[in-house]
Amino acid sequence: MIRLLLTKFKNILLLLLIGVMVLTSMHTSYADEYFKYTVEQDYINISVETMSQAPQRQCEVIIRAGEYQGKAGKRIYVNNATVKLPDDIPLRNDGDGKGFYVSEWDINVKEAKALVEKLQARGINAKLQIAYSKSEDLNAAGRIANKSNPYLYVSLHHNYYDANSTGYFSMYNQNDTQGKAVADRLSNAIANNGQVPMRDSRANDGYIGELNVINKTTTPVLLELGFFSNISELEKICSDSYVQYVSTQLANEITSIIKNK
């Protein structure tokens, strides 16, 4: 009797073991089939967790015009300077006694609009993201972009430091090898602009809010396209020739990235 019970117990254990092995095999096959993406293949880093949480992809690329309209500090006052600007970059005055200034937001919007127009002309499903209030800035900008879940998120900015600073550079998230690859490609694409020198790409160490919150299914890159604190460089980055060159070369490179993903 005891021997019979032991035999039945062994059979039950064997069946349970087989069941566990089958379930494990099914889970592995599912993961391999639906979540097997490489950086080179798809320009994104996908995991089971992030894929299940990410919304449906609504566009291929989001181009964000950095900052929001009227943001304090993102401007250069030009009261005592002679500045040559195109008609679409206004001299603003808030009536606060500080005088006339050029807003970074206006420069960013000009470049972003030109880039989106060229991407769409090349058949890329690109969206333009412009912020008009503080509620759409920093981390909020990243959360807004996440709703569209693009392959690529490119945020266009211009830098401010001192009157002699010069150059453009790109930024990517730390430990994001694909982000670095895209950042380098975009920087190299505009290296021959003849007006603003290229600097090395830099890793975001956590202080750039919009990059911190972007979905892991999206590759985020931020471009600082020149220093508007330098009057000479301000004139260059606002010029139609610079904007057209940069937007054309970026559009070509982004199109190549998307179509060969």
Specify the residue positions occupied by each region the protein language model found:
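Bacterial N-terminal signal peptides that target proteins for export
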Residues: L4-L13
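Bacterial N-terminal signal peptides
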Residues: L15-T24
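Sec-dependent signal peptide cleavage junction
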Residues: L23-Y37
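Active-site histidine-acidic residue metal-binding/catalytic motifs
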Residues: V39-G142
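Structural recognition of the beta-strand scaffold that forms the well-ordered cores
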Residues: E60-R64, N125-I130, Y151-L156, F169-M171, ...
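Solvent-exposed loop/turn segments at secondary-structure junctions
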Residues: E67-G70, Y132-E136, H158-A163, N175-Q178, ...
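A short, glycine/acidic-enriched catalytic loop
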Residues: G73-V102, Y160-N193
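Active-site-adjacent mobile loop/cap segments within catalytic or ligand-binding domains
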Residues: Y153-S155, N159-D162, R202-K261
